[in-house]
């Protein structure tokens, strides 16, 4: 609709009404209560908005003389092509709108719904050109197979964004219907919708925020946005809210750490990649990306939190990953690894080629009695049970059991040197020559923990020249300051490449990495603390003696000046006392 001829004061009235009523109908009396402080002639305001196409008015059924009003969404021309920067800008606006009032997952839901709607409609247009003889319903059925089912064959109704965005009730019904039509792929999404409180947001004091979000997304066309752009936007949203959610206990692995692990475990075509603590799926997605363009790779994840597991599914979809090749199971992997039967269907052994994970650090409550709930505890936890204060080495054993080739695990650095039961398990891993490398990461990489983490690389197929040895990489200085979050650090592409290069070359580099014989580790009582074997070289600072002298001379003169001032004050005070 054209807004050029609408006076700013009437647009202000539009915003006031939108904030108060959203898309819900209201009467003249209701509008007057909201506008009377700013406008003398409310009737004129409503007429101007109606003339501009910003307000819809209909007669009451019981009394034709009285009108019912309803705000029309303020839309502009669609963005023809959404670049990554434009999409991130849109999401930043959305993030500013919701702040702490609305669950950030609503933003992810809207991104998902709008993106698949636009992609679906683009596919419909492509299919119409390809199959000119087919009627529209048959085209919709074909599109259902290509994207997700958004057309209800029985009800003969299409559930896409632009069909329902102007009606709150239809909007919620559409989301629920999409879940119903895609039960296997989107199982759990209905629960996510409930947990975000989205159905009630249209009815409470935050409804204007939700309506503004709908208007915001309605202005963008995602149909030609690549899945890389959409996936990056989804990841950006998770990353943007990570500092806040970390305070509430949610864990998010920085994407750079996931990239580094991909460079270390090197996922390839025709492999099954497992993450038994997959969170929102970011670690698995980075393995997929590393393997090339549209790789023939199967991603398998398990996540204890049901809502987070749904976020992983949406993440896969927006990255263009077919959910036939990406499965997420819900449950506690340490006690009930549900993924095994699926992996067995794919490759027979029930074990993955590569395993990657950032399991909860120092997770308590997983002692011998608890872990024996797992039917395969004798095989999985064959090296022993950790104490109840930290499940780190329970996770390492689980991952080792389900790994055929190589694994990359992010852990708290304390797992490398703590004693007791953990040391007993660690000793077995060292003696059996399962550990290929240990990488000490910089501090302040993780949102919920300032301490440095480590990456443990397990390799069941060590090359002959690496057998009986472990590579220690001290990457504690390999970081840049985080560009968006104060007090945090970040791995740059150069940092990642340097660490990956050191791992591939597997040789000593002064102050950075060292290849250590297992015998030396035994002498150190199986302590794997990276700093014990390699420390960064402290660079000598160049000192300009002339500059130092000038600075000292300056400070000395300032001292003398202030001394004379203070001395004068003291003499004055002394004179007054006498």
Swiss-Prot record:
It catalyses: a 2'-deoxyadenosine in DNA + S-adenosyl-L-methionine = an N(6)-methyl-2'-deoxyadenosine in DNA + S-adenosyl-L-homocysteine + H(+). PROSITE patterns: N6_MTASE (PS00092). GO terms for biological process: DNA restriction-modification system; methylation. Keywords: DNA-binding, Methyltransferase, Restriction system, S-adenosyl-L-methionine, Transferase. InterPro entries: DNA_Adenine_Mtase, DNA_methylase_A-5, DNA_methylase_N6_adenine_CS, SAM-dependent_MTases_sf, T1MK-like_N_sf. PANTHER family: SLR6095 PROTEIN, TYPE I RESTRICTION ENZYME MJAVIII METHYLASE SUBUNIT. The subtype gamma methyltransferase (M) subunit of a type I restriction enzyme. In the presence of the R subunit the complex can also act as an endonuclease, binding to the same target sequence but cutting the DNA some distance from this site. Whether the DNA is cut or modified depends on the methylation state of the target sequence. When the target site is unmodified, the DNA is cut. Belongs to the N(4)/N(6)-methyltransferase family. This is Type I restriction enzyme MjaVIII methylase subunit. It comes from Methanocaldococcus jannaschii (strain ATCC 43067 / DSM 2661 / JAL-1 / JCM 10045 / NBRC 100440) (Methanococcus jannaschii). The lineage of its organism: Archaea, Methanobacteriati, Methanobacteriota, Methanomada group, Methanococci.
């Amino acid at each position: 609709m054209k807004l050029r001829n609408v006076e700013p004061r009437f647009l202000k009235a539009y915003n006031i009404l939108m904030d108060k009523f959203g898309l819900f109908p209201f009467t003249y009396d209701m509008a007057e209560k909201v506008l009377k402080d700013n406008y003398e002639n409310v009737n004129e305001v409503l007429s101007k908005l109606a003339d501009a196409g910003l307000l819809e008015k209909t007669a009451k059924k019981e009394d034709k003389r009285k009108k019912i009003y309803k705000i029309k969404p303020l839309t502009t021309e669609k963005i023809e092509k959404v670049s990554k920067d434009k999409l991130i800008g849109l999401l930043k606006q959305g993030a500013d709108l919701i702040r702490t009032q609305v669950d950030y997952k609503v933003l992810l839901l809207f991104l998902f719904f709008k993106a698949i709607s636009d992609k679906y409609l683009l596919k419909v247009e492509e299919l119409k050109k390809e199959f000119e003889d087919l009627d529209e319903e048959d085209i919709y059925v074909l599109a259902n197979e290509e994207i997700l089912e958004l057309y209800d064959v029985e009800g003969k109704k299409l559930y896409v964004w632009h069909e329902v965005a102007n009606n709150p009730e239809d909007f919620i019904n559409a989301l629920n219907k999409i879940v119903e039509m895609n039960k296997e792929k989107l199982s759990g999404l209905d629960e996510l919708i409930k947990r975000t409180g989205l159905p009630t947001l249209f009815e409470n004091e935050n409804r204007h925020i939700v309506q503004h979000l709908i208007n915001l997304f309605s202005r963008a066309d995602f149909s030609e946005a690549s899945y890389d752009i959409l996936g990056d936007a989804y990841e950006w949203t998770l990353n943007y809210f990570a500092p806040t959610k970390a305070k509430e206990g949610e864990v998010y692995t920085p994407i750079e750490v996931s990239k580094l692990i991909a460079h270390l475990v090197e996922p390839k075509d025709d492999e099954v990649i497992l993450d038994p603590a997959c969170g929102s799926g970011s670690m698995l997605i980075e393995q997929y990306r590393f393997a090339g363009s549209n790789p023939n790779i199967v991603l398998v994840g398990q996540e204890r939190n049901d809502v987070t597991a749904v976020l992983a599914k949406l993440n896969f979809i927006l990255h263009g990953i077919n959910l036939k090749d990406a499965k997420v199971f819900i449950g506690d992997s340490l006690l009930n690894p549900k993924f095994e039967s699926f992996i067995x269907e794919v490759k027979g052994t029930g074990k993955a080629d590569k395993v990657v994970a950032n399991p909860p650090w120092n997770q308590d409550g997983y002692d011998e009695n608890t872990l024996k709930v797992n039917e395969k505890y004798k095989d999985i936890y064959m090296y022993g049970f950790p104490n109840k204060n930290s499940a780190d080495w329970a996770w390492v054993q689980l991952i080792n059991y389900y790994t055929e080739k190589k694994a990359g695990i992010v852990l708290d650095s304390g797992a490398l040197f703590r004693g007791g039961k953990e040391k007993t398990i660690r000793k077995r891993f060292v003696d059996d020559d399962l550990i290929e490398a240990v990488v000490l990461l910089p501090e302040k990489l993780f949102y919920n923990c300032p301490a440095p983490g480590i990456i443990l690389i397990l390799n069941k197929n060590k090359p002959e020249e690496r057998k009986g040895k472990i590579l220690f990489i001290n990457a504690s200085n390999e970081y840049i300051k985080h560009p968006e979050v104060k007090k945090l650090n970040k791995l740059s592409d150069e940092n990642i490449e340097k660490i990956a290069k050191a791992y591939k070359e597997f040789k000593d580099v002064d102050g950075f990495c060292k290849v250590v014989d297992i015998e030396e580790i035994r002498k150190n009582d199986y302590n794997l603390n990276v700093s014990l074997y390699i420390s960064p070289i402290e660079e000598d600072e160049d000192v300009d003696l002339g500059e130092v002298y000038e600075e000292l001379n300056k400070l000395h003169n300032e001292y003398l000046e202030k001394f004379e001032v203070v001395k004068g004050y003291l003499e004055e005070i002394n004179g007054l006392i006498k």
